[in-house]
């Protein structure tokens, strides 16, 4: 001990100084919130009760000069002297202040609920205080922090020091009252904490909510145990189910019902090919597959067109030979098609690009297939062959129309006129003649037609195109029927003259002699045979045909119409054989012509 007992007046000044410093430090450490401030003068006068002295005689006090230091350890013990009555007065003040701090008590209760779990009955009595997951009370883990008697004595000495300092001024007295109120509140908090900790240690372990949850979870563990007990039984059943395997395939089933269903659908109803192992639902599909020998392409019965897949054959029969409707239309020209793929191919026709050009004639096409078809005109190739008669055709549609000869009938027949057709395209064009529909209109003159080929044929009258040339003379024509008529005239031979049976026309060879000029003499046309001798030398000088301006009438009633002018628009017919020209006449030919001239000159004299 650094200080000994001394008279009280000698220690008043240092104690007052230290008490004020301590009060300032304590005000910084713990300041009460403004809502819990109460005036000390209104409730009671602490100066008359806490430090009441009956006699004016001085008493001995041990003061610590280190109290003004900020932090004191709780383990330090401070010796002090006090009056026994002063301690009882302090406790009475504490009991009186308990009723005025209800709001502070509510704050402490909420603070405790956040930290620990407290069970309270209806009378606000604490039943249990626990903390942690296993229901162990928090006091068992952490020992309650109780104030020792030395710490309480230290606080009382501080209060006494502040009481002595209040004698020197009213400001010090006011500060003293505020500090005393704060001290009382701190002690109340500590006592409540100590009481709750003691109750937790002494009370028996009650049944908490967590304990109830644990007891409720026990049956679940039993259920898990039962499940674990059933697990080997289920595994044994699964092993039994896995034994249900299909005899024809490696599939495995859990139940017999699934196995029977699999057998009925897959193996009993499905038709399997013996050669390649392919499966078919219908027997007809299997028979059709076997007809192709599992390798050949599937062929159409009507047109013998081959396909690699069955659905392609169905589409072909539906579109070409059957009942399909053109449901897909072009957005630009409104032309209808059977499938959308045909519409896409048709859309190329509306583009201006023509990248495929013929090397022979220079004509351009939009599709490669159109160029291939066009090239057949130059090459003369006939790639399409009939398997029944080995006849070959240049285009596929020609082969299709030819197949009606072997089938014995044509598939499409008109109900109005009875005309039949090989292809549905021609049948549709023919039906428009009965309905009067003419959807194809000429862009130049506005004339309408039943079919597109007819419209293209009509358009040649405006463009002047002549795509049909004659192989003999090279003349070109606008239509194919005009070329056909021209060929008949080109290869036509005039009919022979009716010669009397007594007259013999010698065909033997004779030395060529210059014949007299026969002009303006009506003669009959010569027979269509070669008059020149064999081995005769052909003249190098071409002479015009002598019969180009003659027309002989053998009938007696028309003898007065002898001189008839030649037809101007018809060219002279060419020679049929590679022989000498007809103006190279022999001697027998000259005598025959002279004889005919004399006979014709005598006939008009008899008529008149």
Curated annotation (Swiss-Prot):
Signal peptide: none
Bias kind Low complexity: ranges: 194-208
Pfam families, A to Z: zf-C2H2
Positions of the UniProt region annotated as Disordered: 61-232
Biased composition (Acidic residues): 98-108, 151-162
GO MF term (any one): DNA binding
UniProt entry tagged with the keyword Zinc-finger: yes
SMART domains: ZnF_C2H2
Mediates interaction with CBFA2T3 as annotated region, ranges: 497-608
Subcellular location: Nucleus
Role noted for this protein: Functions as a transcriptional repressor.
Record PANTHER family: IP01243P-RELATED, ZINC FINGER PROTEIN
Subunit structure, interactors included: Interacts with CBFA2T3.
Stated name of the protein: Zinc finger protein 652
Underlying gene: Znf652
